[in-house]
C-alpha cells in the first residue's frame, strides 16, 4: 500500500485547508485562506501550489473558499465540488470565478493518479 500523508494547514473559522500527498498525487481540500498563505504553508511541508493536482471543496462557506479563485485561476489547479455548492458559490452563471471546474453529485468518487477521493455526507457545526 502506498504511503498517504495528510497535513492540516489551516483549521477554524478564519480558514480551512488540508494538504494530502500520495506517491504521485498532491491535493488540497478547501482553500479557506489566501493563496499566499496556502503557498507559504505548503513550502513549510515541502510542497508548493505548482505541485497540486486538484483542489476539492467541501462546501461553499467563505472559511473554505477564501483563496479558491486565485488558486484555481492563477495556479491552474482544477477544482472539484458538488453541484449544490457550485450553485451557492457561483451566483452569476456567466462568471468565470474558477478555471477548470468539475461538478459532482453530493456523493462521488474521483481517481487522480493512484489516489481515489470519495465524498461522504457529514453534518456541519
Which residue ranges define each predicted feature?
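Beta-strand->loop->alpha-helix junctions that form or flank phosphate-binding loops
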Residues: 10, 54, 101-105
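Active-site metal-binding motif and surrounding structural segment of the metallo-beta-lactamase
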Residues: 36-81, 85
Amino acid at each position: 500500500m502506498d504511503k498517504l500523508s495528510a497535513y492540516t494547514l489551516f483549521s477554524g473559522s478564519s480558514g480551512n485547508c488540508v494538504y494530502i500527498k500520495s506517491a504521485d498525487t498532491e491535493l488540497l481540500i478547501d482553500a479557506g485562506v489566501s493563496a499566499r498563505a496556502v503557498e507559504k504553508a505548503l513550502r513549510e511541508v515541502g510542497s508548493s501550489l505548482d505541485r497540486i493536482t486538484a483542489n476539492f471543496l467541501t462546501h461553499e462557506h467563505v472559511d473554505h473558499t477564501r483563496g479558491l479563485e486565485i488558486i484555481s485561476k492563477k495556479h491552474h489547479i482544477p477544482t472539484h465540488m458538488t453541484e449544490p455548492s457550485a450553485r451557492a458559490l457561483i451566483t452569476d452563471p456567466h462568471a468565470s470565478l474558477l478555471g477548470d471546474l468539475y461538478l459532482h453529485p453530493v456523493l462521488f468518487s474521483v481517481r487522480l493518479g493512484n489516489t481515489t477521493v470519495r465524498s461522504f455526507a457529514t453534518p456541519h457545526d
